[in-house]
Regions:
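C-terminal helical "lid" of AAA+/P-loop NTPase domains
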Residues: 136, 187-190, 201-206, 212-226, ...
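Extended alpha-helical scaffolding segments used for macromolecular assembly and cargo binding
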Residues: 326-411, 415, 420
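Alpha-helical sensor/transducer elements of the RecA-like P-loop NTPase core
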Residues: 3-7, 16-20, 45-48, 77, ...
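Walker B catalytic acidic pair
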Residues: 121-122
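Conserved phosphate-binding/catalytic loops and adjacent sensor/switch elements of nucleotide-binding enzymes
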Residues: 39-41, 45-115, 125-127
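Internal alpha-solenoid helical repeat scaffolds
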Residues: 392-468
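Walker A/P-loop-proximal flanking segment of P-loop NTPase domains
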Residues: 1-39, 45, 49-50
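C-terminal boundary/linker of central alpha/beta nucleotide-binding cores
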Residues: 34-41, 47-51, 153-154, 198-200, ...
């Protein structure tokens, strides 16, 4: 029992994070602080570091929760034991008929000059029980004598609206907990690895700053690549991807395994990309209520959030997207990407449509989406150029049709291969007559774009035209 009343011991990679410790110290002057993020985000480590730093506005009482604590009697027995341990024993008295001492505790705390800081780790395990309602009662009736700090993977269901109205709730979420470049570099240093600046940035892009991902990468780099890091013949990508298998295992065990099968199925169906529009989620899952299901899943797990700029959109962690991709069968993946591509094409999202269709290995349709969407130029310029080029670099050189040929030419131009570009442009021109009249204008523009690119590449427009 007593082990539940102590923060877990710090591991080798425990990192002091002054920016977040200061934020917690400030937040804890309010009545409720919610630290909400998925597994491995560093919630417990942060709270332990904060308590150790001594920046606590009150007497701290820590309780690590598990599923058995959903029972109110069990939960409050640990809280009372924690209070007793720091010399704040609640006077004995008549226990409420419900079997919980929450009313007695509120009365005992009310008016204390020094507040009690009740820290509950894994508070999401309380969701669906009576405990959140009782905690809400305690927070309201103990007044300023109680400060609640809840670490949770999802919404702990403490009723926050009434507290938000008076500004007494602070949220610290996954984006806040994400590692900065300086913090990632320090984690690597704890494992004896000195990565380059670009390597650190690559790790953060790949992990989204997720603390467990950064730590596993540093550990894998130290164990598998040698403590010297990339400076000893290991490139940045080798370091950034060193822990891919370990990260997948962690996510499988800590993130997906605890979820009901229906939730995992929904994530697998819609998690093709990081940003999932609500209508696309409905299309891919076949569930009219997919939006609401994703909202509920986000509240319970913090695995996805509403996109900031577009209300009808959910954002999923890139690590989770990669894990889900690895779990799908090839056939299932192609079906989902083809359906997503068709949906995007119908909504004039040409680049997204092309990427989905190419991922489904439906090359003629992928090329058609680029050409008919007047998006061939995006292979060489624009925010999607790198992603498009990576996808279309796998396009077979003999893909059928004029649209495929002109896209292959544009890919070759982007890669600096004038010979292949000229060959594919010539093939596209030979097939022009096979294109329906209503698509001829889009193809002509694509030919002009690829031809101009070839001319710039060769440095001689006349020579480029002759090569065609």
């Amino acid at each position: 029992m007593m082990s539940k009343l102590d923060p877990p011991e710090a591991g080798r990679s425990a990192l002091s994070r002054p920016r977040l410790i200061d934020r917690l110290a400030s937040a804890a002057h309010g009545q409720i602080t919610l630290v909400t993020a998925p597994a491995g985000a560093g919630k417990t480590t942060l709270l332990r570091s904060w308590l150790a730093a001594g920046q606590v506005p009150g007497v701290p009482v820590w309780v690590s929760l598990d599923a058995a604590d959903r029972d109110p009697g069990t939960f409050w027995s640990y809280v009372l034991a924690g209070l007793d341990r720091v010399g704040l024993a609640v006077p004995s008295g008549e226990i409420e008929p419900a079997g919980t001492p929450v009313h007695l505790l509120a009365a005992a705390l009310y008016g204390r000059a020094e507040p009690v800081l009740l820290v509950l780790d894994d508070a999401d395990l309380l969701a669906g029980s009576e405990v959140p309602e009782e905690l809400d009662f305690l927070a309201r009736h103990a007044g300023s004598a109680l400060r609640l700090v809840l670490a949770s993977r999802g919404d702990p269901q403490v009723h926050r609206l009434r507290h938000r109205l008076d500004g007494s709730v602070t949220d610290i979420r996954a984006d806040d907990l994400a590692a900065t470049e300086a913090e990632a570099r320090e984690i690597f240093a704890l494992h004896g690895v000195t990565p380059s600046d670009e390597c650190v940035r690559a790790v953060l892009r790949r992990t989204g700053g997720w603390m467990a991902g950064v730590t596993l990468t540093a550990l894998a780099a130290a164990e598998r690549l040698g403590a010297a890091g990339p400076g000893r013949g290991h490139d940045d990508r080798a370091v950034a991807t060193a822990a891919d298998a370990d990260i997948a295992d962690y996510l499988d065990a800590e993130v997906l395994a605890p979820l009901p099968p229906a939730d995992v199925q929904l994530l697998s169906q819609v998690g093709l990309v990081e940003h999932v529009p609500g209508a696309l989620a409905v299309e891919l899952s076949g569930r009219p209520a997919a939006r609401q299901a994703l909202d509920d899943l986000g509240r319970r797990t913090s695995l996805l959030q509403r996109c900031r700029r577009h209300e009808d959109c959910h954002r999923m962690d890139p690590l989770l997207v990669r894990l889900l991709a690895g779990r799908r069968s090839a056939g299932s993946s192609r079906r989902l990407h083809r359906r997503a591509g068709e949906w995007c094409a119908a909504g004039d999202r040409s680049v997204d449509a092309a990427i989905h269709l190419a991922t489904a290995l439906d090359w003629p349709e992928a090329a058609s989406a680029l050409v008919n969407g007047y998006a061939v130029a995006h292979l060489s310029a624009g925010p999607q150029a790198r992603r498009l080029l990576a996808v279309f670099s796998g396009m077979p050189p003999d893909s059928r049709g004029a649209q495929s040929a002109v896209v292959l030419a544009a890919v070759a131009v982007a890669r600096g291969d004038a010979e292949v570009a000229a060959k594919q442009l010539g093939r596209a021109e030979e097939l022009v007559d096979d294109v329906p009249p209503d698509r001829a204008g889009a193809l002509a523009l694509a030919l002009a774009v690829a031809g101009a690119g070839l001319a710039r590449l060769s440095g001689d427009a006349d020579r480029a035209m002759e090569a065609r």
